[in-house]
UniProtKB/Swiss-Prot annotation:
Homology family: Belongs to the PanB family.
Subunit organization: Homodecamer; pentamer of dimers.
Residues binding 3-methyl-2-oxobutanoate: D49, S50, D88, K118
Cofactor binding annotation: Binds 1 Mg(2+) ion per subunit.
MF-aspect GO terms: 3-methyl-2-oxobutanoate hydroxymethyltransferase activity; magnesium ion binding
Binding site for Mg(2+): D49, D88, E120
Identification of the protein by name: 3-methyl-2-oxobutanoate hydroxymethyltransferase
Catalytic-site annotation from UniProt: E187 (proton acceptor)
Cofactor(s) essential for the protein: Mg(2+)
Keywords carried by this UniProt record: Cytoplasm, Magnesium, Metal-binding, Pantothenate biosynthesis, Transferase
Known EC number: 2.1.2.11
Root EC class: transferase
Recorded name of the encoding gene: panB
Amino acid sequence: MSVQSAIKRKTAPDIRARKGGDPIVMLTSYHAHTASLVDRYCDVILVGDSLGNVMHGFETTVPVTLEMMILQGHAVMRGSQHALVVVDMPFGSYEASKEQAFHSAARILKETQCGAVKLEGGVRMAETIAFLTERGIPVMGHIGLTPQSINTLGSFRAQGREEGSWEPIEADARAVSDAGAFSVVVEAVAEPLGRKITETIAIPTIGIGASAACDGQVLVLEDMLGLSPRAPKFVKRYGELGPGIEAAIKGFAEEVRSRAFPGPEHVYGMKTKS
């Protein structure tokens, strides 16, 4: 048995069993190198469709394709060993029918070897979630602010902050849980609502701008590292890597232009005859 195969990777049932226990730690990653770093400290690595914003410069996640998700999902699997890897199902890959969702999700699992998929939507996607889980595909749900719905929402604004606006979101949470999802991301909702959902559904909630009471938390890696020029209110910057990277690039450019780089230690001399 190889060392790689002997290492136990976390599974969807492992995460499901964490309900009410130690907080679940989740970050995004899209590359093998960052995945190897995130893997040391996180329970779950999300290959998010936010790669459309972070890697490709799209304004929204809508243009992201299934092929993009599979390519980066495979890279993250190669770079990680311990964490459960969850790959987002992109817009247009699952909404048309349960069968479309199954074929897309099966491709993701087969071609990346990840442990689960994530899809957006509550009540409207409950039948699809049940269809997938009954066929051996673990599903993480996503309710509250659902970025793939930006064209109908109109803007990225927090949900459940108005009087009488909780019930549809609570219904979404119940539907996802009852359909068999192993966990659910709750994004950008009023804090009391995030707390209530966590207390009332059977599966772990993973908050992103929801509540400290959630069973876990997730952020986009580039946001928390200070690499994104703009970040939502719910992001805490744990680093400011942007200025450091810019300084390194500037230093390289200056040394190339002044011919200070490469120096003697960076080039190869002739071999001497023995």
